[in-house]
Amino acid sequence: MRLLHLDSSILTDTSVSRQLTAQVVQDLHAAIDDLHATYRDLAAVPIAHLSGAIAAGFRPLPQPASDAALVAEHALSEQLVDEFLASDIVVIGAPMYNFSVPTQLKAWIDRIAQPGRTFRYTANGPEGLAGGKQLIVASSRGGMYTQGPMASLDFQEAYLTATFGFLGVRDVHFVRAENQSRGPEPAAAALISAQASIADVVRSVGRGVAHARVEA
């Protein structure tokens, strides 16, 4: 059983999303015996943003790239998509930045959203090829976006749900800490609530993993 753990917050010790992913991963290891984890810190070791030359490597090239740096980028793209496809559980720390996801996380998504690998187009429309995974997103936001006047500005969780759904990942679980910029008391209460929700999320993921094993 393979786990892919990604953090994307530009903060370190004070990062709420990092606190949440750490607890999620710890609880997953406690609940699932044979769990082997791969970790990437997308902020500390950022992935280059997609360029035309990098994206060209998603398809067979007429002739191999000769530039060493570009060859390395093509190899990294393959490594990233292989890690994603091999994973049974994906845990992503995704704070909201300017109503969306960190640019570091977007760079990773742009590498793994590869035609023919994680999705394809058919006569009946697009088809995701990365199904069967359990995705847990540790979401931290400065305000309240699940309801109220700011809900229409949520291009973070909505984007992640749509993008991974397009890739075939339907089991998406959010561990959510809102109101992190609304003062110490609301922030602390929201974090405690998010931490308390992790146990239920881990149980749900465990059931999903067990069901997938039976089907396999």
Curated annotation (Swiss-Prot):
Binds 1 FMN per subunit. Its cofactor is FMN. It catalyses: 2 a quinone + NADH + H(+) = 2 a 1,4-benzosemiquinone + NAD(+); N,N-dimethyl-1,4-phenylenediamine + anthranilate + 2 NAD(+) = 2-(4-dimethylaminophenyl)diazenylbenzoate + 2 NADH + 2 H(+). One of its GO terms (molecular function) is oxidoreductase activity, acting on NAD(P)H, quinone or similar compound as acceptor. The keyword Repeat does not apply. Its EC number is 1.6.5.-, 1.7.1.17. InterPro entries: Flavodoxin_fold, Flavoprotein-like_sf, FMN-dep_NADH:Q_OxRdtase_AzoR1, NADH:quinone_OxRdtase_FMN_depd. FMN binds at residues 9, 15-17, 96-99, 140-143. It holds the Pfam family Flavodoxin_2. It is an enzyme of class 1 (oxidoreductase). Keywords: Flavoprotein, FMN, NAD, Oxidoreductase. HAMAP family: Azoreductase_type1 (MF_01216). Quinone reductase that provides resistance to thiol-specific stress caused by electrophilic quinones. Also exhibits azoreductase activity. Catalyzes the reductive cleavage of the azo bond in aromatic azo compounds to the corresponding amines. Belongs to the azoreductase type 1 family. Homodimer. This is FMN-dependent NADH:quinone oxidoreductase 2. The gene is azoR2.
